[in-house]
Amino acid sequence: LTSGGTINGQAQRQEITASSFISSGGTLRIPSNMWVWSDSTSTAALTIDIPCTIINDGKIIGKGGTGGYGQYPASGYSGVGNGSGQDGGPAIKINSSVSGVTITNSSGAYIAGGGGGGGASSVEPANTYAGGGGGAGGGTGGAGGGVGTGNNGGSGGALNAAGSQYIVPSGVAGINSA
């Protein structure tokens, strides 16, 4: 950070707070080569806690939501999301006690909340369970869940994310045992 309020020398910063870089009434410029991100859907990438001006020439992105878990409804599997993807996180939070904030998003820059995680699916009678993909911003893919399983999902990412897939063979744990 220079005395003028520009973040320099780093390609990315995690979960920043305006008052850590500028004084009240100051201007914080996020340069075009900068990514500001969050690793938590409950924490914004940029928290504004003072009156200020933010000029975004870069990218401010929230954490992507976790993908849902694929499951057969009768299996009793209760993974996170229970088949539904989770919400993504915010890109920017302005504290409720703060007023006098101006945000300018330059051409080519973006401010994006994390994408919601994809929902899961299960197919009967083939017993194929596919977890949903994680949301943009780094959400984790959901697991495919068969009877008695707890498969881990794949890692998410800004470009793509996928969960695991699990196929229950006929006759396992009484499923398709005809």
Indicate where each model-derived feature is located:
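Glycine-centric low-complexity repeats
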Residues: L1-G114, G118-A178
